[in-house]
Amino acid sequence: MKRFTLIIDGHNFFFRSLWSCFRQSSKTKILSTQKDIDAYEKKMMVDFCSVVKSVSPIVNDIVFIKDSHSWRKDLLLEHEYKGNRKKTQDNIDMLGFGEAVNNFTDTLVNFGIKVGQAERSEGDDLIYAWSNFLFESGKSSLILSTDKDLNQLIKCVNGIHIIQYSPVSNKLYVSKESNDIIKSISEHKEVQMENLFDELFTISIENDPFEKFVKGTDIEEVSPEEIRFAKIIGGDSSDNIHPVYFKRGDGETKSKGIGPKTVKKIYDTFKGKLGCEFDYHIYSNEDVMKMLCNIIYEIAKIKDDEFTKRMLLENIKTNTKLVALTDESIPADVIDNMVGNINEERLKKSVILSKITRENIFAKSRFKEYKSNIQFDSGTVRGAKGCDMDFIVG
């Protein structure tokens, strides 16, 4: 199997490193001192080296994705989109956080790592743009993130893969087609190999690095279109996106929405009536969307005089823009910005992965020298708490 380009979800990476260092406290604001900023920056460099080492046998290039101000926050009010995350951020000095992650990103640039960053582009958008560009160029991608929103990008066509790896759960998310190939490897079937100088594996199946990697992971087969559909219709509570039908409770009555089981019934019924291959293009077909509205009304048993099918259709359109990662759902200017970033960064030579060591990374940073003893002003904890981990997604 061909080697992958490793695409690292920077936002996800930043907060995994953060919560592996600091314990949330109502008394002490983290990253409010230079000592904490320095320590956090060093921790990210150490974690980056560890991440690369863990997947280096199966990758031959790296793209590190960094968020910018999201166009989605311009589409909805700031307090609505991802507004439920602000309480978690209250305990973080965001100026200190910004200084640390910017310094860390500068270190990656100094080292020659490709960095995906573009104006108005959220990390998910850039991961879509980069993985799609690589896919169309005949190159496979390994997305490193715990964010299940990115499952919608997973696919495999003609042996070109987009798969996702969660380092927290040690889980590999793959399409049915990718999983079939993995199963064939585990059954020790012949794998077509190409020239080693093209950085493809030409060795026996017993020594195949990919086989060794997947043997140490849990594999979950996912349906990208079903995941995208579920987030559009059922919303995404982690991003504060409501279902396409949602009525907030008034204290005496409970809030009403569309739960996962109902979304599944809607999906199965819609897929059965569609009569053609199910992909993201359907969301731009108004007649098909009207059919979907009728199915939602029927299965969700919506009886609300204040809620019309026209409102439902508009909610589907809005959620599609917020949730779906496609050229159709992302604004044209954002696409142009990301294409510009790709065209610039792809000209960089691939970094030799064996050179990504703590000593070499620190040498390119403002610290210049690696020291194993990293100290913090705030309390530290080895491994993040469950409540902390909720914030790293998205």
Language-model features: locations:
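Noncatalytic, basic helical substrate-engagement surface that gates or grips nucleic-acid strands
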Residues: K2-L144, D149-D180, E187-K189, A324, ...
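Accessory alpha-helical DNA-binding modules that contact the DNA backbone or grooves
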Residues: Q192-D336, K348-D377, K385-F391
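Common nucleic-acid-contacting/processivity interface regions adjacent to the catalytic cores
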Residues: G394
